[in-house]
Amino acid sequence: MTILTARPEAITFDPQQSALIVVDMQNAYATPGGYLDLAGFDVSTTRPVIANIQTAVTAARAAGMLIIWFQNGWDEQYVEAGGPGSPNFHKSNALKTMRKQPQLQGKLLAKGSWDYQLVDELVPQPGDIVLPKPRYSGFFNTPLDSILRSRGIRHLVFTGIATNVCVESTLRDGFFLEYFGVVLEDATHQAGPEFAQKAALFNIETFFGWVSDVETFCDALSPTSFARIA
């Protein structure tokens, strides 16, 4: 067991019965020329987030945590995105951007596209799990819940983009399914103004989970920390 200093209070977890979740670290969300950038969102400050996720993944893997990578998107025909009868059709900024700029059709969040790919710096390793997801929450229409329960995993540590959309949505759904969710705030990035990040973190630490940071997380997983607890 290890103790992670967090807000609003410390939380105890067993790394080998926990998972690090990397949410949607795709070119779409973290790279100039990707969907978020083309839709008018600022992605200029995502590089430190990528580096922090690399650090967190390395520490988590060394501690025996399961690493789960999400990729958000749909088939090339966008059948999985839903048609006019789906609220996703009307609210997805990727779909709206493509309707405004038809030349982008088939390029944004389409499986197999550059936009859909994980950023070059983040490469899943053997033993990691990569899951596609068609909506903001990683629990919707995916085997995530089954994967976690079959391994006895109850604690989830979240990183990725966007804090206020897919990260928060997945953590909230996990809360409703009795999972303990922690966000590493400096390994996440919002879609929108800075206040969106602050609001999401406030919601999480006040109502749905815990908030920590990468350095604290890595320190908690270090052998010396385990020795102190033992």
UniProtKB/Swiss-Prot annotation:
<dbReference type="GO" id="GO:0006212">
    <property type="term" value="P:uracil catabolic process"/>
</dbReference>
<dbReference type="InterPro" id="IPR050272">
    <property type="entry name" value="Isochorismatase-like_hydrls"/>
</dbReference>
<feature type="active site">
    <location>
        <position position="133"/>
    </location>
</feature>
<feature type="active site" description="Proton acceptor">
    <location>
        <position position="24"/>
    </location>
</feature>
<dbReference type="GO" id="GO:0016811">
    <property type="term" value="F:hydrolase activity, acting on carbon-nitrogen (but not peptide) bonds, in linear amides"/>
</dbReference>
<comment type="similarity">
    <text>Belongs to the isochorismatase family. RutB subfamily.</text>
</comment>
<keyword id="KW-0378">Hydrolase</keyword>
<comment type="function">
    <text>Hydrolyzes ureidoacrylate to form aminoacrylate and carbamate. The carbamate hydrolyzes spontaneously, thereby releasing one of the nitrogen atoms of the pyrimidine ring as ammonia and one of its carbon atoms as CO2.</text>
</comment>
<dbReference type="InterPro" id="IPR019916">
    <property type="entry name" value="RutB"/>
</dbReference>
<dbReference type="InterPro" id="IPR000868">
    <property type="entry name" value="Isochorismatase-like_dom"/>
</dbReference>
<dbReference type="Pfam" id="PF00857">
    <property type="entry name" value="Isochorismatase"/>
</dbReference>
<dbReference type="GO" id="GO:0019740">
    <property type="term" value="P:nitrogen utilization"/>
</dbReference>
<protein>
    <recommendedName>
        <fullName>Ureidoacrylate amidohydrolase RutB</fullName>
        <ecNumber>3.5.1.110</ecNumber>
    </recommendedName>
</protein>
<dbReference type="InterPro" id="IPR036380">
    <property type="entry name" value="Isochorismatase-like_sf"/>
</dbReference>
<feature type="active site" description="Nucleophile">
    <location>
        <position position="166"/>
    </location>
</feature>
